[in-house]
């Protein structure tokens, strides 16, 4: 196949050696402007009755003498049977005559180059260059119909089937326009529709990015302390700004950096000590803040309606039962009194409770049934802050006229008892059922004057199994760090079978005294050795003014962090620091800037 360059676009079929077809006799391929041609394949039968001269007679009116002569094939050969499906697709011409796209596909069942024999193949030359100069110049545009061509050639199409090229429904083009008339309007519309550039718009659905929400900084969170250099910078920048009001922040930073490098080691130690003290205070405040956050999270995540765990409680003659006092319950428990019966089922909601174990020997001997009930029972004490935050109706809870006060020895005995002597969390569930027996007339209440020790994981699990129903009255604590006064009116006391430890110190019964009235508030005895953790930081040891030579205590001022006694000391300190820096600068001992 050859594509010789010429000024005309033609399709030349030269049968070598045939006198009726020369190189000057050509027939033009129809040019219809911007359109797409799809020529179906034509199967030629080697019928001896085929007269090729009919083809020449049919195309005499289309002959053009401007064709390129091809004299490369001069021998006489016959026509060989060929199956040549030829497809020309997307011949798109613009107004300037430039070829935008052209394609030629030929499928030959027999190769063109074959060994020479009596019947060599016919050579087909297709020239597709410079299509505008030769074809677009004609005023009369004609098309060749496939059926017309087959009728003129007298081809028998039964043996050789015409393979139509596969066309999409959108790009369908009728292959049989009129051979002697110009294009109709609908054909032009089809051509425009086919040759029009198709743009496929693919909408990409992108998920909108959700902006990340920045965590709001808790105003109660303690602020990080400043470094020694930051403290020095804060103290000296005011003096530098006073002398150089037009100085930029970068210039001030360079000056302060050089001043800090030239500062004496003793003066640097002053700032470093302040930073260390501030860091210690920050760590303490941060620990308290995190503890409060954890306690709030624990309160918020408590299951309000947990499944009930039935348990049969009974009084067993053990040598030393215990009274358990809790310090931290996520929410208040207020349930009706449990009637005294040989067997009673108590629903136990899951709660996080700490406990204090008190041996039986510390209870007074005179309070026989009360002592047994209290020793066999579990008394739960709820802090005032938790109950008041949950909205406990205090008016509905009335205390009993009889109250027992747990004094220092009771708390010390409970705190000194080692945790390893406590039964594991699942021990209660493995014990046999027991009956609850208690006197319904006696409803003692316990007033605790001191905060019990912190929680332990084993204590939380243990008391979450079988807490007793209680009615509780809480007196909110004052703002100052004072012991919480919690009054508990016991409705029903659960039995806990815990053997007493021989290592636990037993206090004499005289340590307990019965009060005729409920203790509202009372300061702890001076000999109490119980540490209270309060939110207020410990007082610093004799703070003094930062300015050297001034021994006055600092005055509270938010601008200077309570470090100076007056504004005069602030100015003097900054001036002294600045003057010392100027003196070192004049001596030529200026240190490099950071």
UniProtKB/Swiss-Prot annotation:
Locus of motif Nuclear localization signal: 212-217
Protein's cellular compartments: Nucleus; Chromosome
DNA-binding region: 222-290
Annotated segments matching region Disordered: 160-225, 522-545
InterPro entries hit by this protein: HMG_box_dom, HMG_box_dom_sf, TOX_HMG-box_domain
SUPFAM superfamilies on file: HMG-box
Pfam families named in the record: HMG_box
Keywords: Chromosome, DNA-binding, Nucleus, Phosphoprotein
GO cellular component, one term: PTW/PP1 phosphatase complex
Record's compositionally biased regions (Basic residues): 207-217
Any Gene Ontology biological process: positive regulation of transcription elongation by RNA polymerase II
Domain of life where this protein originates: Eukaryota
MF annotations from Gene Ontology: chromatin DNA binding
Main location: nucleus
Positions in coiled-coil regions: none
SMART domains membership: HMG
Subunit structure: Component of the PNUTS-PP1 phosphatase complex.
Biological role stated in the UniProt entry: Transcription factor that modulates cell fate reprogramming from the somatic state to the pluripotent and neuronal fate. Also acts as a regulatory component of protein phosphatase 1 (PP1) complexes. Component of the PNUTS-PP1 protein phosphatase complex, a PP1 complex that regulates RNA polymerase II transcription pause-release. PNUTS-PP1 also plays a role in the control of chromatin structure and cell cycle progression during the transition from mitosis into interphase.
Identification of the protein by name: TOX high mobility group box family member 4-B
């Amino acid at each position: 196949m050859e594509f010789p360059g010429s000024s005309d676009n033609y399709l030349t079929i030269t049968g070598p050696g045939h006198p009726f077809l020369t190189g000057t006799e050509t027939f033009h391929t129809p040019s219809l402007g911007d359109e797409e041609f799809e020529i179906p394949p034509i199967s030629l039968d080697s019928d001896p009755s085929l007269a090729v001269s009919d083809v020449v007679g049919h195309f005499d009116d289309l002959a053009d003498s401007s064709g390129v002569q091809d004299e490369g094939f001069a021998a006489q050969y016959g026509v060989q049977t060929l199956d040549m499906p030829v497809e020309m697709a997307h011949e798109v011409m613009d107004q300037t005559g430039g070829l935008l796209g052209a394609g030629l596909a030929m499928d030959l069942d027999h190769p063109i180059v074959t060994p020479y024999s009596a019947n060599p193949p016919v050579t087909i030359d297709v020239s597709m260059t410079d299509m505008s100069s030769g074809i677009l110049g004609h005023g009369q545009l004609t098309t060749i119909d496939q059926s017309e061509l087959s009728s003129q050639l007298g081809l028998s199409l039964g043996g050789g089937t015409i393979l139509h090229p596969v066309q999409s429904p959108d790009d369908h083009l009728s292959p049989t326009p009129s051979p002697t008339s110009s294009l109709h309007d609908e054909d032009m519309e089809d051509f425009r529709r086919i040759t029009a550039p198709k743009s496929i718009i693919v909408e990409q659905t992108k998920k909108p990015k959700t902006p990340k929400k920045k965590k709001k900084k808790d105003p109660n969170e303690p602020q990080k302390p400043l470094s020694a250099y930051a403290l020095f910078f804060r103290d000296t920048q005011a003096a530098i700004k006073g002398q150089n009001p037009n100085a930029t922040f970068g210039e001030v930073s360079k000056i302060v950096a050089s001043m800090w490098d030239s500062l004496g080691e003793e003066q640097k130690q002053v700032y470093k000590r302040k930073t260390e003290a501030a860091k210690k205070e920050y760590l303490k405040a941060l620990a308290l803040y995190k503890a409060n956050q954890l306690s709030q999270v624990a309160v918020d995540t408590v299951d309000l309606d947990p499944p009930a765990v039935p348990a049969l409680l009974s009084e067993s003659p053990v040598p030393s039962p215990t009274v358990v006092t809790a310090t931290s319950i996520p929410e208040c428990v207020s349930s009706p009194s449990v009637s005294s019966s040989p067997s009673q089922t108590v629903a136990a909601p899951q709660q996080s409770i700490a406990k204090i174990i008190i041996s039986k020997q510390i209870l007074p001997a005179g309070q026989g049934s009360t002592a047994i009930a209290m020793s066999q029972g579990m008394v739960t004490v709820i802090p005032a802050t938790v109950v008041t935050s949950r909205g406990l109706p205090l008016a509905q809870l009335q205390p009993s006229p009889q109250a027992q006060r747990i004094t220092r020895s009771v708390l010390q005995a409970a705190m000194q008892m080692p945790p390893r002597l406590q039964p594991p969390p699942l021990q209660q569930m493995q014990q046999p059922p027991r009956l609850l027996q208690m006197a319904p007339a006696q409803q003692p209440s316990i007033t605790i004057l001191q905060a019990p020790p912190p929680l332990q994981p084993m204590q939380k699990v243990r008391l979450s199994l079988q807490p007793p129903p209680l009615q509780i009255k809480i007196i909110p604590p004052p703002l100052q760090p004072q012991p919480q006064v919690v009054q508990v009116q016991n409705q029903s006391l659960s039995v806990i079978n815990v053997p007493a430890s021989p290592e636990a110190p037993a206090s004499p019964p005289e340590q307990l005294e019965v009060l005729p009235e409920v203790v509202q508030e009372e300061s702890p005895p001076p000999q109490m050795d119980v540490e209270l953790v309060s939110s207020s930081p410990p007082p610093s040891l004799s703070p003094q003014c930062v300015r050297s030579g001034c021994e006055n205590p600092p005055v509270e001022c938010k601008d200077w962090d309570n470090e100076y006694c007056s504004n005069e000391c602030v100015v003097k300190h900054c001036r002294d620091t600045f003057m010392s820096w100027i003196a070192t600068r004049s001596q030529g001992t200026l240190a490099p800037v950071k």
